[in-house]
Amino acid sequence: EQPCASAEELVEVRRQLMRNGLFVRVAADESIRKVEDPYRVADLQAADVAVVKPAPLGGVRRVLEVAQHLRERHMDITVASALDTSIGINMGLAAVAALPQIYDDEDIDVTPAAAGLATGSLFEEDVTAPRRLHDGHLRAEILAPEPDRLSSLAAPANRRDWWFERLRESW
């Protein structure tokens, strides 16, 4: 996980770790998700692993673009969710499935990591039946919202209107 706020601070963390003989892989999360330039982390060699989240980055295609750039700079990719429901996790599963296989220096298959996609279990309720982990894995099945669950979990009209207004203002 990212231990500090900026890419520059990550560079310093890596420098201090190496200086002290500690070979610990550093992951960048917020420095990719919350900045205008998600490539800066790689350009500065600030991390070993990039945690990419489809929703904040703008979808599966954007994840694939960012992942390609970062991999070309020798960063490993981990796909995670941003506290998504089962519907949002569909996008994370699609992103992992779409990432190309890579091979390490010894021509060994390296499977893209999918960590942090089981965030649906953090919700009391969801708009689908709960996704279940099977031996530490999520099934790559596309879940659709269930009408009864959508109805029972719908926000009150005033809250819905507030969200629509917020979207209009930000658009």
Predicted regions and their residues:
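Catalytic core of soluble alpha/beta enzymes
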Residues: 1-91, 123-133
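Flexible C-terminal active-site loop/helix
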Residues: 82-171
